[in-house]
Amino acid sequence: MISLDKIKEAHKKISPHINYTPLVYSDFLSKNRTVKLKLESLQKTGSFKLRGALNKLLSLSDHEKSKGVIAVSTGNHGKGVAYAASLLGVKSTIYMSSMVPEYRKLAIETLGANVEIVGQNSDEADSVSYTHLTLPTNSRV
């Protein structure tokens, strides 16, 4: 389990780089209890995935950052990694399968990442990414 101290540490690291997204009460979901929705769709990349990507990249040493990062994604994680990498001046490569729609690939490229289309599905793209991870050039996000 992740400790509260680790959560606070991550929050402190990523805070300067993220949007603060609101909690909104949901009438529909609050029938028997109070339910609030965290509107991460208002985040800079449109999802919560940016938070984890930023925390990981901000945790890398300068030496690790200099080698670049790789990730496998079908969309939002890739956008988060691409945005975080661009923000920090880190080269990023996102592996995607041929099943991923072109607009998702373009969105990630627009954020500055190199996109490699490999395999017919996410499992195959993941396998290919591991072959690149064994090279002394990348950290996996």
What are these regions (language model features)?
Residues 1-133:
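PLP-dependent amino-acid enzyme catalytic core
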Residues 132-141:
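Single conserved hydrophobic/aromatic residue that forms the stacking wall/gate
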